[in-house]
Amino acid sequence: MIFGKYINKYYLKNAPILILGLAALILVDYFQLFIPELYRMVINGMNGDPVLVNGQAAVFDMEFLLDQVCRPMIISIIVMVVGRFLWRVCFFGSAIRVVTDLRTCMFAHSKELSQEYYQVNKVGNLMSLYTNDLDTVQECFGDGILMFCDALFLGLLAVIKMWRMNHFLTGLSMIPMAFLMAAGTTLGKYLMKKWEERQAAFSELSDFAQENYSGLAVIKAFVKETKELMMFRRLNRENEDINVEYTKISTLLNIMVTLFVESVICVILGYGGYLVYCGSFDAGQLVEYIGYFSAVVWPIMAVSMLIEKTSRGKASLNRITELLDAKVDVKDRGGVQDLPSIHGKIEFRNLTFRYPDGEYDVLKNVSFTIEPGESVGIVGKTGSGKTTIVDLLLRTYNVPDGTLFIDDHDVNTVSIHSVREGCAYVPQDNFLFSDTISGNISFAFDDENQEAIEDAAMMSDVHDNIAEFKEGYRTVLGERGVTVSGGQKQRISIARALMKHAPILILDDSVSAVDTKTERTILDNLKKREGLTTILIAHRISTVEQMDKIVFVEDGEVHAVGKHEDLYRTCTAYRKMVDLQKLEEEAGEE
């Protein structure tokens, strides 16, 4: 059995079912210990020794055999079969429900964590929590309760019956048990440590494989298949070595249990045979005693397995607890309210920002205002802080008080949900789900309105491309949209954002993979949306030339804000960037 702050509540939640399973288990144990008494009657009857039933002598004949042996044996077997089915359903069913709830809790908490967490913790490691570690917890919860309760009740009842038959022989039989418990406790701690190492090695292996599958095209392009294979073999060998070491310790524990059991059997046969020889025991009593000890063998084995499973379960639960203990950095403050109907005014007011683990400010005293319905381009060199600006607008990170306002509301005084609900976002990587094109475009809604989907696709100039596909809008995209081109991915992502009909549209370098003609068509279509506040991050100045306003960012600072013509005339750094891009375009044409 395992205990922890995130799993203890499930014992109470499943208490009625667990109690029912426990009752069935005790009933099975009782009838299991009734069977050795039947063995004694049969053997004594066949040997001509007295057959005692409830302390009274009985005649051993066919009627006795049917009434006192066969019928009780059949009833016991039926009760044991039904009881075992019942406790298996109760214990293992509870374990499945516990892991289902725990998995949901983990997923819900994961969704609340900030990007910083996922930058530190790799996807492969997280996936191993949802697979290997949860499977281990499920096994430990279900099997652990079974083994603990069965070892406790069956072992205790059997030892009591053995003690009543002969105190000294029972004392001798229990001596190896003390050594087993001491050895098991020591090995259990070592097993827990090795299981943690095993899970960590498996996580690293899973993450490496996941990263390779995602970057397979790059690996092939650079002809690095052999290098990556050698790396995988090294990680796989490390995983193998840890598993082998864990298996050695686990096997040693099992061998010790077997050794103790066999040694006790030798003691029982030796001293028990002596008692039979002296007349203190008859043959039937010796067989009955061995039958009780046979019932103790399973609890002894269960203790060994329980130590191993508990060690594994604790290690896996510790890893899961680390995830559930991860602090939710970006969350609503107490008493916040939803934004009312958003008009689209955005104001940055002397905003300075540094990433939580950063060593310097990535944004410094950023100030500019976007009026409702304006189209604004944000340009600057790579790493100047353009994407950070929209990350803060989307509340991906915490924003300093009094520095960012939407419709004159400080974003820290309104709910994060309402801020994000009012924004439609097209990220740089243009992530698409492994779903139909229709499903991707209508992602913001629970149902698919085909007319609205096609309207959004037309605005992003991707409708004609989709129509050329054999399945049209029902075409299923591969993982991350690998079955479509880069330009098509961008335009499908734009269509998804447009279909949301949010008052604020954010495009983070989202037309870089399309040609100039397609880019112009998309931007012209965006202007037709009345009241739409558009923020477009771009590297090409030509992309934002026609915007109502351009924000020029350099080294985390806003150097200039205004129309293209004004900036070209008044801002030297902006003019140099424009001239340089024109020279690059002319050189490319030549």
Give a label for each model feature.
Residues 2, 91, 111-156:
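Juxtamembrane loop-to-helix connectors within ABC transporter transmembrane domains
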Residues 13, 17-30, 76-80, 143-197, ...:
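Transmembrane helices of ABC transporter permease
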Residues 106, 110, 219, 320, ...:
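Helix-loop junctions and hydrophobic alpha-helical segments within the transmembrane domains
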Residues 161-178, 249-318, 324:
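Helix-loop-helix
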Residues 110, 232, 320, 348-350:
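Conserved catalytic Walker-motif region of ABC-type ATPase nucleotide-binding domains
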Residues 13, 115-116, 132-141, 145, ...:
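An intracellular "coupling" helix at the cytosolic face of ABC transporter transmembrane type-1 domains
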Residues 339-590:
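ABC-type nucleotide-binding domain
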Residues 1-35, 47-72, 86-91, 95, ...:
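Membrane-integrated ABC transporters
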